[in-house]
């Protein structure tokens, strides 16, 4: 655990991966369309093309209009360079969600949100960009707030030419901080140390299992990604087990991300991880049930987001077992919860 933050730039990612065709793609009632609006704004239009009302999780997803989470992915240089994301990635406590954490869409209904991409991405150099939205959106049945599954979504490719000077004038969703002292003291410090120790143990065990191909098809859809899965998990184990880590750990809320049901969040551009109050009050040190949430796998989840640990950092393509296992192989390989769920499964022999 490190006291001063380290700034890092998100590493290159493949445009081909973002735009690849998923041969296992499932039918979905969701239609997502992106359209340019002004210099750097993107209008996102979500339509329910199904025959029944949908109760979709908005908290922490691309539908979230409060938290500065990644709503679209942007690529430059003809699609070869992923644009650095400057917001936060969160892990939610998936039990005890509230009705206002969801968006209800009747059959045929449309919801529109506007995303100011310059507030969340590094666009000051300007140029040509390709924009996507793709993942699995968790839902609850009827008026329930208990997650029941996930629905795939994939937008069109939106090509934009952005004026860098104009984009640079847009206020950032998160203000940069040069140094933030750790507030993990007393019992919180003890809890975080235990979580990181367990994180290192679980990540090491999961890395060994991945090398052997154990359970990979369930959580990552293929065994061909074994070396990448294992390498990321080994990097996480190293960081969780180090006293001179590549991430900064904090127990207060300097970026105001600890809203209801947020267990922890990471600011990837700073390799900065914050553990929220419910991380300490609502989670066990280690889960005793398959796919259960705990402090160890929450730490592991957040560590995978940090590009300073393993580059590029992961996305939040799908929360929870249902959403994570609905992802394509490429999406799962870059999904934080897939690693957390996999580590849990190896630990408990699920």
From Swiss-Prot:
Disulfide bonds join 184-251, 258-276. Zn(2+) binds at residues 301, 305, 316. Its EC number is 3.4.24.39. It is found in: Secreted. InterPro entries: Fungal_M35_metalloproteases, MetalloPept_cat_dom_sf, Peptidase_M35. Binds 1 zinc ion per subunit. It is an enzyme of class 3 (hydrolase). Residues 19-180 form a propeptide. It holds the Pfam family Peptidase_M35. Belongs to the peptidase M35 family. Secreted metalloproteinase that allows assimilation of proteinaceous substrates. Shows high activities on basic nuclear substrates such as histone and protamine. This is Neutral protease 2 homolog SNOG_10522. It comes from Phaeosphaeria nodorum (strain SN15 / ATCC MYA-4574 / FGSC 10173).
């Amino acid at each position: 655990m490190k006291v001063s933050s380290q700034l890092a730039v998100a590493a290159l990612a493949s445009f081909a991966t973002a735009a690849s065709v998923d041969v296992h793609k499932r039918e979905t009632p969701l239609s997502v369309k992106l359209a340019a609006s002004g210099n750097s704004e993107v209008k996102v239009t979500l339509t329910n093309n199904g025959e029944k009302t949908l109760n979709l999780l908005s908290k922490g997803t691309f539908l979230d209009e409060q938290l500065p989470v990644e709503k679209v992915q942007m690529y430059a240089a003809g699609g070869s360079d992923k644009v650095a994301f400057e917001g936060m990635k969160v892990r939610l406590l998936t039990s005890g969600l509230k009705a206002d954490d969801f968006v209800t869409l009747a059959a045929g209904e449309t919801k529109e949100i506007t995303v100011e991409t310059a507030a969340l991405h590094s666009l000051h150099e300007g140029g040509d960009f390709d924009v996507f939205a793709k993942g699995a959106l968790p839902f609850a049945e009827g008026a329930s707030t208990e997650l029941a599954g996930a629905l795939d979504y994939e937008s069109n490719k939106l090509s934009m030419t952005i004026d860098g000077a104009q984009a640079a004038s847009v206020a950032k969703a998160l203000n940069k901080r040069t140094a933030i002292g750790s507030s993990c003291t007393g019992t919180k410090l003890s809890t975080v140390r235990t979580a990181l120790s367990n994180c290192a143990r679980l990540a090491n065990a999961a890395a060994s299992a991945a090398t052997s191909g154990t359970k990979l098809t369930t959580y990552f859809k293929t065994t061909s990604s074994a070396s990448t899965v294992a390498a990321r998990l080994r990097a996480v184990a190293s960081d969780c087990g180090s006293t001179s880590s590549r991430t900064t750990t904090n127990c207060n809320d300097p970026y105001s991300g600890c809203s209801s049901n947020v267990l922890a969040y990471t600011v990837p551009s700073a390799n900065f991880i914050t553990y929220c109050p419910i991380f300490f009050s609502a989670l066990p040190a280690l889960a005793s049930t398959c796919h259960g949430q705990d402090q160890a796998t929450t730490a592991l989840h957040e560590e995978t987001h940090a590009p300073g640990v393993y580059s590029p950092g992961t996305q939040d393509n799908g929360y929870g077992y249902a959403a994570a296992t609905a992802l394509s192989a490429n999406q799962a390989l870059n999904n934080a919860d897939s690693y957390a769920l996999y580590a849990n499964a190896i630990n408990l022999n699920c």
